Amino acid sequence: MNEPIVRVPWPSRDSGGSDATLNREWLVTNGLGGYASGTLVGIIARRYHGYLVAALPAPFGRVMMFNDLVERLEFPSGKLYQLGGEERAGVPLKMEAAEHLAEFRLEAGLPVWRYELESAVIEKRLVLPHGQNSVHVNYRLVSGAEKVRLMLRPSVHFRPHEEAVSAELDAAYVLVVADDRYEVVLGEKLPPLRFLLYGSRAQLTVDKLRIQQIVYRIEERRGYPARGDLWSPGYFHAELGPDADATLVASTEGWECMYGLKPSEAIAAEQ
């Protein structure tokens, strides 16, 4: 029997305030002890928020490997929209995603965001394949535009998932590129974080960046260290169209494992 679709009312009656909005969260697990979690509006606010907390062999345990993903959409009109992101110290918090989020739902326990921007409808879907330290983030143009340019900036801070966000960010991250394979490497102890981008005109623009003084509002409210830095290798981009989805895959698994499960297969396997 298929699991029911659970729809979360949005805008909600408590979505007017920033703190209340950031309290609306999601969580997905991978069957290994790893997980992904975040707020519905895409702002990281806890030390546990991230796209991939990998369950690694001892002595590492659960490690935050893929912290955040800033999403931008550029329309043929030239208009640019940002979804998600970070709150920065001294900068007013903007939750642009909240203005355009028409619906959030769970399909078979997996989160789906439905955005309405200009005349277009775009859906984002997140899948953690069972038994893998991997995450698939899929974007689909449902209707309303011939094409939309998608830009994705991932950022990382490899750390134990319970460690404070203020822990020092290592300066030795290295980006390794070979054809369509991208790896973020930090020394020899932890596995690299590997990326694949499926989509039309998919590529990476190398633009290394240290994102400083991110505020984790829920950590701050709880009295814990609440400011930290992330490192980004650059940004991926692809073109969305009526028959052209895009999927970013991030994983600590080997390349054979990543290539062995296509995005459509990952979605079908979890439904």
Language-model features: locations:
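Terminal accessory carbohydrate-recognition/targeting modules of carbohydrate-active enzymes
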Residues: M1-Q271
